[in-house]
Amino acid sequence: AGAGFVKARISPRFLYGKLFPCGIYCVEGERGMRICFVTGGSLAEFSDRWQEAQAEVVVCGFQALGEVSYERELRGETSLFEDVALLSREAKNVVIGGCFTDARGMRRKSVVVAEKGRILGVSDMVNRIDGSLYRAGAGVKIYETAAGKLGIIVAEDLYFSRVAETLAVCGADAAVCVFEQFSESLEPMLARAQAFLCGLPVLLCGYGYALIADIGGKVRFASPGSPCVYDLEREQEYHLVETRRRGFYRSGRKGF
């Protein structure tokens, strides 16, 4: 690819991709949910390029918004959440962005979700490891959008399989995980495992890298470029799983 273009690694099942002059690499499969990953730069930098992507869902890493103070947002000193809502209104899509929220000194890793000009909600990381600087929030959330039911996994919650299991049981069409900096191979491996075990695609977006794991546990898409676009086909499969185990013993009553 020439200068300014983004490379992507795709599954052999897809026959071709397109290189757009705007520098966004789009891989075409069966038409489904078009996802745009922003793995570098701020939201303001991407806000001038959203028309190039024509995506139904835009997923931004933590670098896009950075630090967000609820108090300063309420006082009007900053407008980061408003910027997310405005971008979703202009693009007429769903915008998902990671950020570090501060509520009177309580810092959390969070993900804000907006659709067509409206903030749908903010999801916080629900698990705290070894007394981390970032506090645990409450509740795993699924957002019903025009693009489908999107479940949110915040950062290190990816390490806890119950989060993805909860999203799958509650009917999410896909799990979107916004991470910070990936280790060498741990997070992609976990995304693939949870996609296979829970039966829902896992979209992983972090600094400098994006990945999609399909329900077969395979890497459907991966790219270090920003922004990059992929058409995610909708997949849902159900299987009867039976387990033989000890316990649950009940003796019959006698002497009726």
Outline where the language-model segments fall:
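CN hydrolase (nitrilase-like) catalytic-core segments centered on the catalytic cysteine
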Residues: 76-94, 161-228
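Cys-nucleophile CN-hydrolase/nitrilase-fold catalytic domain and related Cys-dependent amidase chemistry
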Residues: 43-116, 183-192, 196-200
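Active-site beta-loop-alpha substructure in enzyme catalytic cores
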Residues: 34-60, 64, 134-198
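Active-site catalytic loop in hydrolytic enzyme cores
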Residues: 103-170, 189, 237-250, 254-256
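Short, Lys/Arg-enriched N-terminal segments with co-localized hydrophobic residues
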Residues: 13-32
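Residue-level detector of high-confidence beta-strand sites
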Residues: 122-124, 142, 221-224, 231
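Extreme N-terminal basic, low-complexity initiation segments
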Residues: 2-14
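Fold-independent oxyanion-binding glycine-rich loops
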Residues: 40-41, 62-63, 98-100, 116, ...
